[in-house]
Amino acid sequence: EMVALSGSHTIGQAR
């Protein structure tokens, strides 16, 4: 899973 915004699953979530 790759997050882009913060260190959580919010905006840039590519799962």
From Swiss-Prot:
Required cofactor(s)? heme b; Ca(2+)
InterPro entries to which the protein is assigned, alphabetical: Haem_peroxidase_sf (IPR010255), Peroxidases_heam-ligand_BS (IPR019793)
Q: Name one GO biological process term.
A: response to oxidative stress
Domain of life assignment: Eukaryota
Q: Which reaction does it catalyse?
A: 2 a phenolic donor + H2O2 = 2 a phenolic radical donor + 2 H2O
Entry annotated with the keyword Nucleotide-binding: no
Q: Which GO terms describe its cellular component?
A: extracellular region
Q: How is the cofactor bound?
A: Binds 1 heme b (iron(II)-protoporphyrin IX) group per subunit.
Q: Where does Ca(2+) bind?
A: 10
Enzyme class, UniProt record, top EC level: oxidoreductase
Q: Which UniProt keywords apply?
A: Calcium, Heme, Hydrogen peroxide, Iron, Metal-binding, Oxidoreductase, Peroxidase, Secreted
- What EC number(s) is this enzyme filed under? 1.11.1.7
Decide whether keyword Ligase is in the record: no
User: Subcellular location, in the record's words?
Assistant: Secreted
The residues that hold heme are 9
Q: Name one GO molecular function term.
A: metal ion binding
Which family would the database say this protein is a member of?
Answer: Belongs to the peroxidase family. Classical plant (class III) peroxidase subfamily.
Q: What job does the chain carry out?
A: Removal of H(2)O(2), oxidation of toxic reductants, biosynthesis and degradation of lignin, suberization, auxin catabolism, response to environmental stresses such as wounding, pathogen attack and oxidative stress. These functions might be dependent on each isozyme/isoform in each plant tissue.
Q: What is this protein called?
A: Peroxidase 4
Which species is this UniProt entry from?
Capsicum annuum (Capsicum pepper)
